């Protein structure tokens, strides 16, 4: 996993986003055991407290659960994962639409560009 961070937002928030993306994309499948806080903190080169805070946020969102003395796991509730996936997709779409509108494109023009892009992708 790419653990590069930027200064635009807190590191724990970026960790949450990266792990969430791994979960909703299936890289971390339902029921998968996650590495320990210390191991992941060392891997990402962040403070264990930062990693712990990210895990707490993921638990609060229902994407991760803890089992006493066994560790943390990705939820097995596929509905929660799908809802998180839809929410992330909505954020991406809103960001894309805002950027395209700033470039001066209308909704129809954006749709046309997307259709063109899809056709090019098929070729």
Regions found by a protein language model. Give the residues of each.
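Short secondary-structure transition/capping segments
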Residues: 44, 78-79, 120-122
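Short glycine/serine/threonine-biased micro-segments
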Residues: 24, 29, 60, 67-69
């Amino acid at each position: 996993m790419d653990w590069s961070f930027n200064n635009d937002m807190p590191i724990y928030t970026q960790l949450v986003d990266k792990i969430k993306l791994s979960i909703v994309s299936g890289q971390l499948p339902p029921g998968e055991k996650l590495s320990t806080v210390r191991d992941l903190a060392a891997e990402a080169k962040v403070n264990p407290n930062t990693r712990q805070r990210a895990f707490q946020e993921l638990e609060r969102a229902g994407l991760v659960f803890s089992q006493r003395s066994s560790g943390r796991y990705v939820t097995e509730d596929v509905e929660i994962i799908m809802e998180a996936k839809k929410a992330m997709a909505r954020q991406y779409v809103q960001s894309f639409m805002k950027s395209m509108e700033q470039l001066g494109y209308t909704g129809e023009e954006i749709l046309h560009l997307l259709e063109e892009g899809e056709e090019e992708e098929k070729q």
